[in-house]
């Protein structure tokens, strides 16, 4: 598996637990040509960072790292997309794999999505990011079939409203 982790803000760093201890080639904030060359050697690729339905943002958040120009290279891959609206990107281009939708990973996103700020929100959000990451890591280590991830995650998520919001729109596509 190839992991491409675009660390643009501290909250994106919290998702490194997803690939910790896995046999994976990990690229942190790589150049596009390096990433595209590495992609040729792998059947599964995981992208982590911030983004929207049109792609994964670059580390400066002023453009895209992954956009429609990548689609041809991704069509025959299994993709794990961990960025806001990755599921929309996958659906738009017919990609297969596991994807998040709008995924609240920091306090400003919490407020932007209409949730009230609460005491210790920073710590709770960090804890839930870590919990999500550790769960995906276990699924990957134990070869849990990807088509079971969404249901399993939704059944096990905490009852905090924003967490339920995050998990309700997880997306799997074959």
Describe the role of every protein-language-model region.
Residues 1-48, 80-82, 153:
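A domain-level signal for caspase-like cysteine endopeptidase catalytic cores
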Residues 9-14, 31-33, 50-57, 85-89, ...:
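Short acidic, S/G/P-rich loop/turn micro-motifs used as interaction or catalytic elements
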Residues 19, 59-62, 94-96, 113:
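Short, glycine/charged-enriched secondary-structure capping and boundary segments
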Residues 52-74:
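A short, glycine/acidic-enriched catalytic loop
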Residues 78-174:
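Active-site-proximal C-terminal subdomain of hydrolase catalytic domains
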């Amino acid at each position: 598996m190839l992991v491409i982790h675009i660390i643009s803000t501290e909250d994106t760093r919290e998702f490194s637990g997803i690939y910790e201890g896995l046999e994976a080639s990990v690229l942190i904030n790589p150049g596009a040509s390096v990433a595209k060359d590495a992609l040729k050697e792998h059947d599964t690729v995981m992208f982590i960072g911030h983004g929207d339905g049109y792609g994964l943002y670059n580390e400066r958040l002023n453009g895209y790292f992954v956009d429609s120009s990548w689609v041809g290279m991704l069509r025959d891959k299994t993709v794990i997309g961990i960025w806001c609206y990755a599921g929309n990107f996958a659906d738009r281009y017919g990609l297969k794999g596991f994807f998040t939708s709008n995924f609240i990973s920091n306090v400003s996103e919490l407020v932007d999505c209409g949730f009230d700020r609460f005491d210790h929100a920073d710590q709770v959000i960090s804890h839930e990011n870590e919990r999500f990451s550790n769960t995906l890591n276990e699924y990957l280590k134990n070869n849990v079939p990807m088509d079971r991830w969404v249901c399993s995650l939704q059944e096990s998520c905490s009852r905090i409203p924003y967490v339920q919001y995050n998990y309700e729109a997880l997306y799997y596509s074959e």
